[in-house]
Amino acid sequence: MACGLVASNLNLKPGECLKVRGEVAPDAKSFVLNLGKDSNNLCLHFNPRFDMHGDINTIVCNSKDGGAWGAEQRESAFPFQPGSVVEVCISFGQTDLTIKLPDGYEFSFPNRLNLEAIEHLAADGDFKIKCVAFE
């Protein structure tokens, strides 16, 4: 995967929302949005997989604590199409993160690290970011 956007010092607090809009590559295999304290401490690893690591059209979410991955959570909802422009909204809560997909479907992922602020955002893979907004 090519290295994409990395942003730090975001200071996203509980109750706030991060919107990421971008273009999925026409030949997409997978892309990643990571949120957390830094690259070794992620409260959310959001990884839509078109065809990667044995997963087909599956969203894999995880956390990373001190460099160690947690248990994966898989979502079968998959509203992503290669070559399309999509928006993902991630609402940061004290106990969990709510991810709203482009088709309006929402699911939650626990804030396993109990972070009080998200400082780090990284995007990677077959996804070109067009806009990042904070609400």
From Swiss-Prot:
A biological process term (GO) from this entry: apoptotic process
GO molecular function: lactose binding; laminin binding
Signal peptide segment: none
Pfam family, one: Gal-bind_lectin
Entry GO CC: cytoplasm; extracellular space
CDD domains per the UniProt record, alphabetical: GLECT
Residue(s) carrying Phosphoserine: S30
PROSITE patterns reported for this sequence: GALECTIN (PS51304)
Presence of the UniProt keyword Cytoplasm in the record: yes
Main location as per UniProt: secreted
InterPro entries for this protein: ConA-like_dom_sf, Galectin-like, Galectin_CRD
Keyword Phosphoprotein tagged: yes
Modification type N6-acetyllysine: residues: K13, K19, K29, K128
Modification N-acetylalanine, positions: A2
Keywords attached to this entry: Acetylation, Apoptosis, Cytoplasm, Extracellular matrix, Lectin, Phosphoprotein, Secreted
Residues involved in a beta-D-galactoside binding: H45, F46, N47, P48, R49, H53, N62, W69, G70, A71, E72
Compartments reported by the entry: Secreted, Extracellular space, Extracellular matrix; Cytoplasm; Secreted
Domain Galectin: 4-135
Biological role: Lectin that binds beta-galactoside and a wide array of complex carbohydrates. Plays a role in regulating apoptosis, cell proliferation and cell differentiation. Inhibits CD45 protein phosphatase activity and therefore the dephosphorylation of Lyn kinase. Strong inducer of T-cell apoptosis.
Oligomer and partners: Homodimer. Binds LGALS3BP. Interacts with CD2, CD3, CD4, CD6, CD7, CD43, ALCAM and CD45. Interacts with laminin (via poly-N-acetyllactosamine). Interacts with SUSD2. Interacts with cargo receptor TMED10; the interaction mediates the translocation from the cytoplasm into the ERGIC (endoplasmic reticulum-Golgi intermediate compartment) and thereby secretion.
Protein name (record): Galectin-1
Organism: Sus scrofa (Pig)
Lineage, highest ranks first: Eukaryota, Metazoa, Chordata, Craniata, Vertebrata
